[in-house]
Every structure is written in structure tokens, then in C-alpha cells.
Swiss-Prot record:
Keywords: ATP synthesis, Cell membrane, CF(1), Hydrogen ion transport, Ion transport, Membrane, Transport
Name listed for the protein in its UniProt record: ATP synthase gamma chain
Transmembrane domains' residue ranges: none
Lineage, uppermost ranks: Bacteria, Bacillati, Bacillota, Clostridia, Eubacteriales
InterPro entries xrefs: ATP_synth_F1_ATPase_gsu, ATP_synth_F1_gsu, ATP_synth_F1_gsu_CS
PANTHER family the record matches: ATP SYNTHASE GAMMA CHAIN, ATP SYNTHASE SUBUNIT GAMMA, MITOCHONDRIAL
CDD domains, per the entry: F1-ATPase_gamma
Amino acid sequence: MAGAGLLEIKRRIKSIKNTRKITKAMGLVATSKLRKARQKLTENNQYFSSLDEIARELIGSLNSNNNPLLKPNDNPKKLIILLASDSGLCGGFNGNTAAFVRDNYENNLENIEAVVVGKKGIHYVKKNKISTLAEYVDLGDTPNVGDASTIVNKAVKEFTDGNFGEVSLVYTKFFSPVKQEVVEEKLLPLDLTGEKGKVSFLIEPDEDEIIDSLVSSYLKGKFMNAMFNSKASEQSARMQAMDGATKNADDLLNSLDAKYNRIRQSIITQEISEIVGGAEAQK
């Protein structure tokens, strides 16, 4: 029986070692992707910070307020664009975003609909009984303007058609490799209140046309910034999850190695005792 126990332990050790190779490799890949994602996020933060400053100064200095995306409506319904991931094995990254919506709107879910970005987020949104309006999957590791435009245009149409009174973004903001936080930011109606009189602008020939173009660029820029934050947070969560899995595998291997050695030592001791006992009996 002890010999059978050794074989079972050896089988488990082999299986865990194979799994450890996978988690270790995935952790290294996530670390590499995180490094690239952080670089792209840093660059995008600089761009969006400048865009935000310009937009607020320009809108704040103009008298025109004809753009419908700057005006609220009375519809109580809210559209939430929820950023998740297409791939799993990233800890609570996807579950936390859906749980955030549930916890903050549990008494008003009948007025909430979601646009889900990321295949893995769909399961958690439905699990938390949140209605979905649209789903976007397989967008890739690097956010691009084409995808951002498609999703933003969908939200804009829903808002301008009066189907929703507010559109917001729920995503995981990246602060550091060990700190990410689910946040909600209002997207529509757009609030670009600036300090009036700080900067003077002379716009010709059409002020409304400039505002329309600026608002469109701002919405896409804000959404892209959220996507870059989400991607960096996803890779950080996956890196931590795989590092944790690798450490757990190491701990389990150490425990199994110790157990294997104890059983093996017990078998050897028993065999020696039997040999010695047999020799004594023959005297």
C-alpha cells in the first residue's frame, strides 16, 4: 500500500510541475505585456491631459452651447460601458467590475443597461443580473481608435436618440502594479466646464463646427484613456494571479516532496526491520 502511495505522489508531483511551467510562463508573458501597456498608458495620459486642458479652456471661453452632447436630458435610464477582458486567468479583474455596478445600483438595476467590452465580462454581467445592450469582444491587447470610435458612436447615438439620460464608463484604473481600482466616470452628457476668460479664442467661420469636432475627439480620447488603463490593470492582475499560482505550486511541491520522503523512509525502515528480523530468526 505504501508503494502505491508513492506512485500517486509521484504522479501528482509530475502534474503540478507541468502546471507550474504553464503558470510561470504565463506570468512572464503578463509581465512583458504589462511593461508595454504601462508605457502606452503613460504616453496616452500625457496626450489626454493636454486634450482635456485644451477642451476645457476652449469650451469655457465660448458662449455657444448648441451641441446636444453637452446638454442633459430627463431620461432616468443610464447606460454603463463596462470594460473587461477577452482572456481569463486574471484574478478578480472581471468579476470586480460587474460587482461594482451591482453594488452601486442594486436598488435601481431596472434603469441600468450595459455595453460590455470584453468576452469574459459578459458572464459576470449576466451573473449579476445586469441587462446588456451590446457586447464587443476580441478587440486585442492594444486599444485602437477604430474600436473606440465604434463603441463611442454607439453610446452617442443612444444618448442623442433619448434612450438614456446618462452614459458612464466603469473600468479598472491603473495606479501601480500592485494597486488598481474600479472607478466610474461620466461620459455623457459631457461636462467640459472651464475657467471663463482664462484664454480668449477667435473662431472662424463656424464656432459650432469646431465644438462638434472637439467634443467628438474628446469623447474618443477619454474612452481610449479608459481602455489603456483597463489593459494595464488586466495584465497586472494576470501577472499577480500567475505569480500567486506559481508560488502555491512551489508550496505544494515542497509539501509533497516532504511527504514522499517520509513514506519512502518509512518503507526503507520497514524493509530493514524485516531483513534484520529474518536474520535474527535464522540464528
